[in-house]
A protein has these predicted regions:
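Short amphipathic alpha-helical interaction segments
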Residues: 316-332, 342
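Winged-helix-like regulatory helical subdomains adjacent to P-loop NTPase cores
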Residues: 245, 251-319
Length: 358
């Protein structure tokens, strides 16, 4: 039997759990002329939610990861490539009739994938406007769905690009945009701050942790049926107590627990054994991460092991310095702030605890 838990890639089909509320909201947005903005911490399953929702939507989809884009022209090239993948060149010609700067299109002789380029020094804003408007013209009654992952990366490309994109995208009636990113604070800054060009651009959909009862049922149903239900429930509770219902880390720990159960059949201490295995397997990565940090960051992380101890208290380091360290740690994804500061990765927290106790 295959391991029924999955992490590290898109989770869909039988591996996908819950999110019925968020799926319903996203589907409602896609059935309207509006746009969706997905906001959550890293590894909460935004991409999986989108993929799972789009499985039932019979419409064309273009998806671009902004981390792979290095300029506005490269963004236009990516959009054209996706467009020509959906529409063969001969059939797509009439959508290009209004294009002011015509792209050079060729096809990879091995893969057949479209390749797009422009004459050097062409007007970048015109190129970008043309690319977006080609997508708009190809929409029609069945609106095109355009997904931008890691959307805040646009701020790193060119100054003022966010204003240009907003001016283009707000005119479109034949496209539903889905904008998302793993930098929660940046997403909030881009879409919830009044001064941002994308303020109120779309319907905000916040992804929180999966409710414990739902996640518990999901785990219990997938643990080996040879175990008594009481044992499966106890194991599920121990998993969720450690991961605090974080979607990614729960799947990761459940995967390892299931694997070890298949190997040994020993239920006693199975969750702690799986935790130890995962922490040990990431020792090199955690060590490199720790070595890259300055003294203040390390001190803050050590103090946060005891979650009841505010990192600002009882410290010889100025509060302003600690606050700056907290901001850095949140920005890098090591910490998350939900009321108070917490570790994002419970396995890294366990590693730091072991380091402190040496």
């Amino acid at each position: 039997m295959d391991n029924p838990f999955k992490f590290g890639s898109i989770v869909e089909g039988p591996y996908f759990t819950d999110r019925s509320r968020e799926r319903a909201i996203l589907r409602q947005v896609l059935d309207s002329p509006n746009h969706a903005v997905l906001i959550s911490p890293r590894r909460y399953g935004k991409s999986s939610l989108v993929v799972e929702t789009l499985r039932d939507v019979k419409r064309d989809v273009i998806a671009v990861n902004m981390q792979a884009v290095t300029s506005s022209t490269k963004l236009a090239e990516a959009l054209y490539r996706k467009f020509f993948t959906l529409h063969p060149l001969e059939k797509a010609r009439h959508f290009l009739s209004g294009v002011r700067i015509v792209p050079t299109v060729s096809f990879n002789p091995v893969s057949g994938a479209p390749e797009v380029s422009f004459v050097p020094d062409s007007d970048r804003q015109v190129i970008l406007e043309d690319a977006f408007n080609v997508l708009e013209n190809s929409g029609g009654k069945k609106r095109l769905i355009v997904v931008f992952d890691e959307f805040p990366e646009i701020l790193q490309l060119e100054k003022g690009l966010d204003k240009i994109l907003r001016s283009i995208m707000q005119e479109h009636k034949n496209i539903n945009y889905i904008l998302m990113g793993s930098q929660e604070e940046m997403m909030k800054k881009n879409f919830l701050r009044k001064k941002s060009p994308f303020y109120h651009f779309g319907v905000p959909i916040h992804l929180d942790k999966i409710p414990a009862p739902d996640f518990r049922d999901y785990i219990v149903q997938r643990l080996p049926s040879t175990l008594q239900e009481e044992s499966r429930c106890h194991i599920a509770d121990d998993i969720l107590a450690f991961t605090d219902c974080h979607p990614y880390y729960t799947q990761q720990l459940a995967f390892q627990v299931w694997f070890e159960l298949q190997q040994t059949g020993n239920v006693s201490g199975i969750v702690e054994s799986a935790i130890s295995h995962i922490v040990q397997s990431h020792d090199f990565d955690y060590s490199r991460l720790w070595e890259s940090m300055n003294k203040t960051n390390r001190m803050v992380l050590m103090k946060l092991i005891d979650e009841d101890t505010p990192p600002m208290e009882n410290s010889e380091i100025p509060a302003s310095t600690i606050f700056s360290a907290l901001k850095r740690l949140v920005s890098s994804g090591i910490l998350i702030k939900k009321g108070k500061y917490r570790y994002d990765d419970p396995f890294f927290k366990k590693w730091v605890l072991q380091l402190r106790n040496i």
